[in-house]
C-alpha cells in the first residue's frame, strides 16, 4: 500500500471531519414543551491524533482489511429556550406578549362587543393567514374583506389587523381581537402555532 498517498488523505481528514457545535434555539410554552425550533442543534466533532494512521492503515490494507476506525471527540450543543405566551385582558382592553416571563409588548385592542363578547379561557394559536375575508358567507351577519395578519386561537376568534376603525380600547368586534395593522403583524410573526393565549376579565 502507498503509505505516502494515504498520508495525503489523512492530512485532509480534519478539514472534512472537524466542525464546531451548533447550539439549538427553540420557542417553548409555559410547560417547557417546544412549539417551534428556530435552529436545530448539532454536536461538534474533532478528529483525534492522526499520527501513525497512514502506517497503520497501510499495514491493514496489506492484510486485505480496508476498514479503519478514526478517533473522533464529540462536543455537545446547548439549547436556548425562549418561553412565549399571550395574555388578553378584556377589562383593560389590552393584549400583552410575554417572553421569558417579562412583558415584551402591550397593545391596546378592541375585543368582541355585546352579544359577540370574546370568549374567556385558555387557548393556543392555531391557524394563521396573512389575509382573508371575514364573515362573507351564509350564517354571518357581516362581511369584511381583506382582513390582514390573522392568528386564530379559539375557533373563529383570533387576533387581526383592523383598518375600518381606530377606536381601540373599546369593545368593537364580532369576537376577534382588533389591533392596528402593524401590531397584528408583529404578533403574527412573534407567536408561532401552539403559543398559549389566556383570555380573561
Residue ranges: model-predicted function:
Residues 1-85, 92:
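Short glycine/threonine-rich beta-strand-turn micro-motifs
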Residues 7, 117-122, 129-201:
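Exported/periplasmic cell-wall-interacting domains
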Residues 11, 22, 29-33, 39-43, ...:
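Solvent-exposed coil/turn segments that connect beta secondary-structure elements
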Residues 20-22, 88-93, 145-146, 191-193:
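A short, compositionally biased
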Residues 27, 85-87, 96, 108, ...:
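Soluble periplasmic/extracytoplasmic beta-strand elements of cell-envelope proteins
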Residues 34-35, 103-106, 120:
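Short, mixed charged/polar active-site loops
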Residues 44-47, 105-106, 113-116, 133-134, ...:
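A short local loop/turn or secondary-structure capping micro-motif enriched for an aromatic residue
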Residues 76-113:
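A structural motif detector for short, solvent-exposed N-terminal "entry" segments of globular domains
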Amino acid at each position: 500500500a502507498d503509505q505516502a498517498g494515504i498520508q495525503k488523505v489523512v492530512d485532509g481528514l480534519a478539514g472534512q471531519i472537524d466542525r464546531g457545535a451548533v447550539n439549538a434555539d427553540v420557542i417553548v410554552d409555559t410547560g417547557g414543551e417546544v412549539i417551534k425550533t428556530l435552529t436545530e442543534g448539532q454536536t461538534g466533532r474533532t478528529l483525534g491524533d492522526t499520527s501513525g494512521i497512514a502506517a497503520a492503515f497501510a499495514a491493514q490494507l496489506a492484510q486485505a482489511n480496508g476498514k479503519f476506525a478514526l478517533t473522533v471527540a464529540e462536543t455537545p450543543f446547548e439549547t436556548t429556550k425562549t418561553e412565549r405566551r399571550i395574555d388578553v385582558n378584556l377589562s383593560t382592553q389590552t393584549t400583552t406578549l410575554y417572553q421569558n416571563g417579562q412583558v415584551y409588548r402591550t397593545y391596546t385592542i378592541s375585543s368582541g362587543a355585546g352579544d359577540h363578547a370574546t370568549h374567556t379561557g385558555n387557548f393556543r394559536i392555531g391557524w394563521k393567514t396573512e389575509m382573508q375575508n371575514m364573515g362573507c358567507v351564509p350564517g354571518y351577519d357581516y362581511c369584511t374583506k381583506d382582513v390582514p395578519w390573522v392568528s386564530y386561537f379559539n375557533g373563529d376568534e383570533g387576533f387581526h389587523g383592523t383598518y375600518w376603525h381606530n377606536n381601540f380600547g373599546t369593545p368593537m368586534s364580532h369576537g376577534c381581537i382588533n389591533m392596528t395593522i402593524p401590531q397584528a403583524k408583529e404578533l403574527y410573526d412573534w407567536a408561532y402555532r401552539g403559543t398559549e393565549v389566556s383570555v380573561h376579565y
